[in-house]
Amino acid sequence: MSKRPAFPGMGGMNMQQMMKQAKKLQEQMAQEQENITTQEFTGKAADDMVVATFTGDRTLKSLFIKPEAIDPDDPDMLEDLVIDAVNKGLKQIDQATQQSLGKYTKGLM
């Protein structure tokens, strides 16, 4: 009885080798994700009038608002600045995640 042929396009890897490789990649991805969660990401709006700082797991760590950004006659402006700073911080997390984990997910979708 002959051995089963390797899967075409897999470089001659058998199923056990493929599983080992998949486990190794999974461990590397988990380490990359852990590295991201320990980093801090900052979004700033209007010359640092509002600064939002996040951890890599998307937790808001701090929100700094300069007193001059608080205008009782224009609360919408402050809302817009906070939204802008928060969105910029979250975008930084997304970009770092894509840069770090993108090398593992290329070609999967």
Swiss-Prot record:
Signal peptide: none annotated. GO terms for cellular component: bacterial nucleoid; cytosol. Keywords: Cytoplasm, DNA-binding. InterPro entries: YbaB-like_sf, YbaB/EbfC. Binds to DNA and alters its conformation. May be involved in regulation of gene expression, nucleoid organization and DNA protection. Homodimer. This is Nucleoid-associated protein Ldb1634.
